[in-house]
Regions:
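N-terminal glycine-/serine-/threonine-rich beta1-alpha1-beta2 phosphate-ribose binding loop
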Residues: 1-97
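General beta-strand structural signal in soluble alpha/beta enzymes
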Residues: 62-63, 79-80, 103-105, 128-132, ...
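Rossmann-fold NAD(P)-binding glycine/threonine-rich loop
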Residues: 88-98, 107-145
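A short hydrophobic/small-residue beta-strand
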Residues: 102-103, 378
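Rossmann-like NAD(P)H-binding beta-loop-alpha module
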Residues: 122-203, 210
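Catalytic, metal-anchored helix/loop core of enzyme active sites in primary metabolism
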Residues: 153-157, 165-168, 172, 184, ...
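Substrate-binding/catalytic subdomain of NAD(P)-dependent oxidoreductase enzymes
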Residues: 180-278, 283-285
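A conserved regulatory-domain signal marking ACT and ACT-like small-molecule sensing domains
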Residues: 316-428
Length: 428
């Protein structure tokens, strides 16, 4: 190792995460050099607006031309924190083909084009690392790829979106309604101005696709992931979950079964004794079940300037070590299997269904008959009388295929005695 050597990097983007990376490099420069075996220098920073004032940043490093980084032979590492698919994909591919190592936090890109980028890195014998793309400061990619490599992983279940976990925590602990909790999340900076990707499960879906690909050694893309958000969860559902001894979480779920990979994001009622049930506020956690190691869980900050920068710099230090030992590209794509992803309609789940019906004789029997016709077994029923001759029914099913439950609900909607199908939530 040569601590006097300085490895030079190009930084693509100087927003929240990019600024965190720059701060860490400047503040931890000497310590990182000791850990990595060589120093690190940010040689150039690609920005969109050269005229924007940036406190604490050496303005001479800024450029708005990708070619200034791409054509600089001294730059050995490209750190991409711009986000989005393009132009990030094109830039990363060009960098990899030119023999530059790449570290990214871009979940959208990895979930959609990860296989292509890993193959390009393998062909060029360079590193393409993306620990920060899934759960911020939480190490999960490296454990799945390396630490648990001797295991057959059966399931990966995670709370991988801090915004929705914060909102659900407020619903559960403070009795807030969804809109007020979302407004608070926005005020505190947890939610974006357009929160759709968070509250509809899209952000978590991209992260689950990445984890499933690595855990099960097979290609899973975001298009394979069923996604459902938390916008329909009400205080009433939280109360029933409490009555059942459960809490409601937005979970990314990936199972490796004999019939194929099951992968989805949706709200789920989980028992309070499950490790994920106690994950509060904006924290993230990933629960992994495997044959040899058993149950393991990884917990921490899932987003933010410095937590994400921490994961990025962990990858950068790994790349510097690989450069020192001339072993870049040593961990290539591990998707050597061709396991199919199951059609989500064929996946089995237990369900909680809350509905409003006419309160008169024979209605419950008719509903039970409809469920029977569609192969849905009922585990329990709770009935509460409401005003206007209505009854609120809560039905919990045994494990049933998604398509059978969907057909049964469609049948119930057409019945004259059904006033409303309220919330449908899966149970762990």
């Amino acid at each position: 190792m040569n601590q006097e050597r300085v490895v030079k990097a190009g930084l693509l983007g100087l927003g929240t995460v990019g600024s965190g990376v720059y701060k860490l490099v400047e503040c931890q420069k000497d310590e990182m050099a000791m850990k990595a075996g060589a120093g690190l220098k940010i040689q150039k920073i690609l920005v969109h607006n050269m005229n924007k004032k940036r406190e604490g940043v050496d303005q001479s490093l800024l450029t708005d031309k990708w070619e200034d980084i791409m054509n600089d032979d001294e730059i050995e590492i490209v750190i991409e924190v711009m986000g989005g698919i393009e132009p990030a994909r094109t830039m990363i591919l060009e960098a990899l083909h030119a023999g530059k190592n790449v570290v990214t936090a871009n979940k959208d890109l990895v979930a959609t084009h990860g296989h292509e980028l890993l193959e390009a890195a393998e062909e060029s014998g360079v590193d393409f690392l993306f620990e920060a793309a899934v759960a911020g400061a939480i190490p999960i990619i490296r454990p799945l790829k390396q630490c648990l490599a001797a295991n057959e992983i059966q399931e990966v279940i995670g709370i991988v979106n801090g915004t929705t976990n914060f909102i659900l925590t407020k619903l559960i602990e403070e009795g807030m309604d969804f809109d007020d909790a979302l407004a608070l999340a926005t005020e505190l900076g947890y939610a974006e101005a357009d929160p759709t990707a968070d509250i509809e499960g899209l952000d978590a879906g991209r992260k689950v696709a990445i984890m499933a690909s690595i855990a099960f050694h097979s290609r899973v893309t975001f298009d394979d992931v069923y996604t459902e958000g938390i916008t329909k969860i009400t205080a009433k559902d939280v109360e029933y979950a409490e009555e059942f001894g459960d809490v409601i979480k937005l979970l990314g779920v990936a199972h490796n079964t004999e019939e194929g990979i099951e992968v989805a994001v949706h709200p789920m009622m989980i028992p309070k004794e499950h490790p994920l049930a106690s994950v509060r506020d904006s924290f993230n956690a990933v629960f992994v079940r495997s044959d040899a190691a058993g149950d393991t869980m990884f917990y921490g900050r899932g987003a933010g300037e410095l937590p994400t920068a921490s994961a990025i710099m962990g990858d950068v230090i790994d790349v510097i070590r690989d450069i020192q030992y001339h072993c870049t590209g040593r961990i290539s794509c591990t998707c050597y299997r061709e396991t199919p992803v199951k059609n989500f309609k064929e996946v089995k789940n237990k369900f909680y269904i809350r509905m409003l019906v006419d309160n008169k004789p024979g209605v419950l029997a008719a509903i039970a008959s409809v469920f029977g016709v569609h192969k849905v077994s009922i585990a329990r029923v709770i009935q509460n009388t409401k005003e206007d001759d209505a009854a609120e029914l809560v039905i919990v099913t045994e494990a049933v295929k998604e398509k059978h439950l969907e057909d049964a609900l469609a049948h119930l909607v057409d019945m004259d005695t059904t006033r409303e199908i309220g919330t449908v939530i899966r149970e762990y």
